[in-house]
Amino acid sequence: STGETPNIFYYPAIAGLKEWAQNGVLLDLTDSLNEDEEWKNTFLDGALDTYDLSAYGVDGIYALPNELNVDAIFYNKALFEKAGIEKTPETMDELYEDIDKLVAAGITPFGVGGKNTWVMGHIFNNILAKRIGRDGIIKLGTGEKKWTDDDVVECLQITKDLKDKGAFAEGFEGMDYNTQMNQFLTGEVAMISHSSPIIPEMFNSESEILDDISFFAFPYFEDKPEYK
């Protein structure tokens, strides 16, 4: 709002950079990258493609990746065993079955810090990715696809259905990230959906269940195998 911008800044969502790039606030890094192959080659194959705004209607690369994250569902092997779950789920139908088994065994399936929307986003965003794919998500960012579109509303409904199945800890709407992590690391809940940067946090903790922690990829929908 002051018209003054820092030389370098961190921004978490690439789609949000579109307006700034269009208004000339950001520097197009394409030429700089092409002129310095050594620098350009320090990035993993495909990493820069994510930051190419041409999909959003603006030609050029206006940001660079600063870390590589992997989303996963972290789970407590001992609680899975207690509920009679013999293997981790690969499909959403298998996840639904495992949730039912956990609930039947008196175990809360997911810890969720619903008070922090970005935490809840780990579940919803994965559902979105597994239903509409990368192209669909890009179209949401450009406005070509609407949040009221049937397939997007379906993703919201699937998230609500998980809540209605008892998948989330009671009162999760008022819980924050720290509460979620505490529940998982003390064995109160069987799973959390998160990304790889939490791994050091978990293993630097004094949790007594570290040997029971493992992870699996967010399950896919059998009718959408192309987004597996």
Language-model features and meaning:
Residues 14-72, 96, 123, 151, ...:
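Hinge/lid segment of periplasmic solute-binding proteins
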Residues 1-46, 50, 78-83, 87-90, ...:
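Extracytoplasmic "Venus flytrap"/periplasmic binding protein-like
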Residues 53-66, 71, 96-145, 160, ...:
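Extracytoplasmic/periplasmic solute-binding protein
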Residues 11-15, 177, 194-199, 219:
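Beta->alpha turn/N-cap motifs
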Residues 99-101, 141-172, 218:
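Glycine-centered hinge/linker elements that transmit conformational signals in sensory
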Residues 1, 15, 92-96, 172-185:
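Short helix-initiation/N-cap motifs at beta->coil->alpha
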Residues 30-46, 114, 131-154, 204-207, ...:
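Short, solvent-exposed loop/beta-turn-alpha elements that line the ligand-binding surface or hinge
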Residues 2, 82-83, 165, 204-228:
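Extracytoplasmic/periplasmic substrate-recognition and gating elements
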